[in-house]
């Protein structure tokens, strides 16, 4: 199994390799510890690059840890998803988390769920490298198993041979994207806090979900029916959960440590069901709870502190 890690600037140079991994269906895990340009200050500015940085038609799986424990747990899950769907998986960490010191529970090895790639069940002479199973994922032998392994970034047929037939090109990339789209239930993860009766919703991911949750709890102490939707998976977008929250709430606050990027996705998915307000910070520091509450106060005309 393959993994590498970088911090923002280095992630730029990995985009061609990620494109290759998508097209060649090569399972791997990339950890990007987001930081401000040239400095070790905190940010969530690589959000769109994690989804759209690589060229060509593709879906990306991107996980957003909010703690040291989640960074550990999400990395294990990233390997499982990469192996299951033969795709690169991004763990989008942040300087905030990288510099944290927190307790970490490491389970016993037999308590950790591990998914190993599905290998061919046919004899070597019958193996077709890109003949997909019903779930859209071709079995993948390991190097040394004796099977013919061929990886190519170029359009190819089931045998792995390069070609330029338009219908084969379309068939290939429809399958590569659909194997992610069709497994929404398995890939997408969110956490809900105080949402049962919420009329004011906060949506956050990564380290920003920490002060956002405290802001929700403080607002509730003041009688405001607030709740938090925490996104553990940010790509694919948790559209169902965001849409349900938008239909339930009068207003959604999108809390981010950038100039306001994922808010656009929340607005798109909400589709006018409620107002979406951006709470952004782009100063190399995580939001404080007070800053989030101050922005909520300004919009709602209430005193929450």
Regions found by a protein language model. Give the residues of each.
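Glycine/charged-rich beta-loop-alpha catalytic/anionic-binding loops adjacent to active sites
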Residues: 1-3, 33-35, 55-62, 194-195, ...
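Phenylalanine-focused residue identity feature
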Residues: 13, 20, 41, 52, ...
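A structural-propensity feature for long, helix-poor, extended segments
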Residues: 41-59, 249, 254
